[in-house]
Structure formats: C-alpha cells, structure tokens
UniProtKB/Swiss-Prot annotation:
It comes from Priestia megaterium (strain ATCC 12872 / QMB1551). F-type ATPases have 2 components, CF(1) - the catalytic core - and CF(0) - the membrane proton channel. CF(1) has five subunits: alpha(3), beta(3), gamma(1), delta(1), epsilon(1). CF(0) has three main subunits: a, b and c. Transmembrane segments: none annotated. One of its GO terms (cellular component) is plasma membrane. Pfam families: ATP-synt_DE, ATP-synt_DE_N. SUPFAM superfamilies: Epsilon subunit of F1F0-ATP synthase C-terminal domain (SSF46604), Epsilon subunit of F1F0-ATP synthase N-terminal domain (SSF51344). Belongs to the ATPase epsilon chain family. Keywords: ATP synthesis, Cell membrane, CF(1), Hydrogen ion transport, Ion transport, Membrane, Transport. This is ATP synthase epsilon chain. The lineage of its organism: Bacteria, Bacillati, Bacillota, Bacilli, Bacillales.
C-alpha cells in the first residue's frame, strides 16, 4: 500500500513526522479518512484523536483543535496543542480534568463555563488517548 507523509506541528514545534498508510481524524464537518492520492483540502479540526495507521500498528496523537491540510502525498496538521500517546502525562491530565470539573460544579458567577467545558474535553481526550480508548 502507498504511504502518505504526515507532519503534526504546534506553535512549540513539530510533534510527529512519519510515513503512514492512512490518517483518520474528526474534523468540524465529520470523520475523515485520508489515503495517498487524496484530493487537496483544508479542514478545521475538533479536539480529538488523530489515528495514524502503519502496516502493523496504529499510532495516536491527541490534538486540541487546529487545521488539517491535505495534499495528494502529504498531510500537515497545524494544531494548537498536540501530544503523542506516549508523551501524555496522565497525572497532569487527571489534575486538569479535576480542575475543570470543579469549575463547572462551582456556583460562582465568575466561572467561564465555555472555557471550563473546553478544558474538560481536552483533558478527557488526553486521558482516552493515553489509555488507547480509540
């Protein structure tokens, strides 16, 4: 099977770069599966997992939004934040989840609910990917 080059980049620098058989992820418009030769496109990404299928394994990268650029032989993911499953600090993600849940449970008027919901979604995504629940 032909491969496609994938780069995952954040403002802090590159996170992942490799040749893979298939890239699948969730964009704002729905689930995308990308193989070599895919038509060029750009799509905004949701907080979620990028699944990178190789011949004998699947690697996971947690992304916190961003954009996906597809060319026939290359996929570039420009993410606000990204971590491979192996790089995720589970204790830190669990703490972030607890903080977000506490903010959402708080009855204070100064809590930014939308921001707390996004923080919770990011933390849960990181935990799911670290435990390979995809």
């Amino acid at each position: 099977m032909k491969t496609i080059h994938v780069s995952v980049v954040t403002p802090d620098g590159p996170v992942y770069e490799s040749e893979v058989e298939m890239v699948s992820t969730r964009a704002q418009s729905g689930e995308l599966g990308i193989l070599h030769g895919h038509i060029p496109m750009v799509a905004p990404l949701q907080i979620g997992a990028v699944r990178l299928k190789k011949a004998s394994s699947t690697e996971l990268v947690a992304v916190s939004g961003g954009f996906l650029e597809v060319r026939p032989d290359k996929v570039t993911i420009l993410a606000q934040a990204a971590e491979t499953a192996e790089e995720i600090d589970v204790a830190r993600a669990e703490e972030a989840k607890k903080r977000a849940e506490m903010r959402l449970d708080s009855k204070q008027d100064d809590v930014d609910v939308k921001r707390a919901e996004i923080a919770l979604k990011r933390a849960v995504n990181r935990l799911d990917i670290s435990q390979r629940k995809f």
